[in-house]
Regions:
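Short, surface-exposed patches at the edges or C-terminal ends of soluble domains, predominantly
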Residues: 1-336
Length: 336
C-alpha cells in the first residue's frame, strides 16, 4: 500500500544525516500555464483531452476520467508531477530522505522563489525548466546570490534542466521542418521553454544555452528504443555514467549548446545520436549528436557541482529502463 498523500502544506526541513537531500523545483507558474487559452496554437501545454486523444487508449481508464482527473492543461501538468514519483521513490530509498517538490507558483497561488527556505536542507537541487519563455519567469538577483552562497557549501549539486526550444525562428517553413522532425502532434510548431533557467544560467555564469527539440536515434528495427549515448567516461569523475548506456526516449530533446570552449571546467559527459532520417537544420549543419549531459566541476569559491541534463530523464511519461534508474542512483548517491 502506498503512503497517504498530502497537499498544500508547509515544508518540514530534513535533518542532515549523511544521505543526500534532494529537492525538485518546477520553474513554472502553475496558474499561468494551466490557464493558457487552448485556442492558442503555440507556446502552451496540451490539454489532458488532447493527450488522451493522441495517446489513445493509454489514458482510457477510470483513474483518468472526468470524475477523477483534470481534463484541461492542468491535468497535463499533473501528469508531469506523477511522472517523477518513481524517481522520488528510488531517491528516498537510497538517501533515507523524501524528495521535496517545490513550484515557483503553485496551484494555490503561493509564490516561492529559490531562497534559504529551499536551500538550507537541500544538497541536490534539481531545477526543472518547464516554464514557457513567454511566461517571463526570471531569476531575481536575490535568488542568484542565494544559490551562489549555497554552492559554496561542500557537497552541493545544482542540476539545471532547461527543456527544448522548438520553432524559435520566424521562418514558418523551418518551423514545419522541425515539427516533422520530432513528429509529436502534442508539440506545436513553436514551443519555447525555460526562460527562468536561462536567466539563472546567465546569472551564475553557466555558458550553456538550450536550443532545438531533437529526435534521438533509435536502435535499428525499433520505434522508441533509444540509441546508446556516446559517453566520455574518463571525464566523469562523479560516476554519473556508471552502468548507464542509454537515457530516456523523448522525441524532442534539447541540445545544450556551449557558449564557451569545452574545457576541464566545462565537460560534455554524454552526447546523444540524433535521428538522421528526418531532416532538421541541426543535422543539415553537419551535426550527428547533441550534447545531453554536461558537468561543471567545482572551481574557485564554488565548492558544489553544476550538472545539466533534461528533466525528461527523471520522469516515466516516456518510459524508463534499468539504465535510467542507474543514472538516478548515481545522481542521488554521488560524493558529498
Amino acid at each position: 500500500m502506498s503512503s497517504a498523500r498530502t497537499y498544500n502544506q508547509d515544508h518540514i526541513a530534513r535533518p542532515h544525516s549523511g544521505g543526500r537531500r534532494v529537492s525538485i523545483y518546477w520553474t513554472w507558474s502553475y496558474p499561468w500555464e494551466a490557464q493558457r487559452d487552448p485556442r492558442e496554437l503555440d507556446n502552451r501545454f496540451s490539454t489532458m483531452t488532447e493527450v488522451r486523444q493522441a495517446a489513445w487508449p493509454t489514458y482510457e481508464t477510470p483513474e483518468y476520467d472526468i470524475g477523477h482527473f483534470l481534463q484541461g492543461i492542468d491535468g497535463t501538468l499533473e501528469l508531469f508531477h506523477r511522472s517523477t514519483l518513481a524517481f522520488q521513490e528510488l531517491a528516498g530509498s537510497v538517501t533515507g530522505h523524501p524528495v521535496a517538490v517545490f513550484q515557483r507558483i503553485d496551484q494555490a497561488g503561493y509564490r516561492l522563489p529559490i531562497d534559504d527556505r529551499i536551500l538550507d536542507d537541500t544538497d541536490t537541487l534539481m531545477v526543472f525548466g518547464l516554464d514557457h519563455v513567454i511566461g517571463e519567469q526570471e531569476a531575481a538577483p536575490e535568488e542568484i546570490e542565494a544559490i551562489q552562497q549555497w554552492l559554496q557549501r561542500d557537497g552541493t549539486c545544482l542540476l539545471l534542466a532547461p527543456h527544448h526550444d522548438v520553432g524559435f525562428t520566424d521562418d514558418l517553413a523551418q518551423r514545419q521542418i522541425e515539427y516533422l522532425h520530432h513528429g509529436d502532434p502534442l508539440v506545436p510548431r513553436q514551443q519555447r521553454f525555460s526562460q527562468y533557467t536561462r536567466s539563472l544560467m546567465k546569472g551564475l555564469g553557466v555558458p550553456v544555452r538550450n536550443t532545438w527539440g531533437l529526435r534521438p536515434a533509435v536502435v535499428e528495427g525499433t520505434t522508441n528504443q533509444i540509441a546508446p549515448v556516446s559517453g566520455v567516461r574518463d571525464l566523469d569523475a562523479l560516476g554519473l555514467l556508471n552502468n548507464v548506456t542509454t537515457f530516456n526516449f523523448h522525441p524532442h530533446l534539447p541540445h545544450y549548446e556551449l557558449t564557451a570552449p569545452e574545457s576541464d571546467a566545462l565537460r560534455v559527459l554524454a552526447r546523444q545520436p540524433v535521428e538522421l532520417s528526418r531532416p532538421h537544420p541541426f543535422t543539415e549543419a553537419g551535426n550527428r549528436e547533441f550534447n545531453a549531459l554536461i558537468w561543471l566541476p567545482p572551481t574557485g569559491e564554488r565548492a558544489g557541482d553544476i550538472v545539466l541534463i533534461d528533466s525528461t530523464h527523471f520522469t516515466t511519461l516516456f518510459g524508463g529502463t534499468d539504465s535510467l534508474r542507474n543514472l538516478w542512483h548515481n545522481l542521488v548517491s554521488m560524493r558529498g
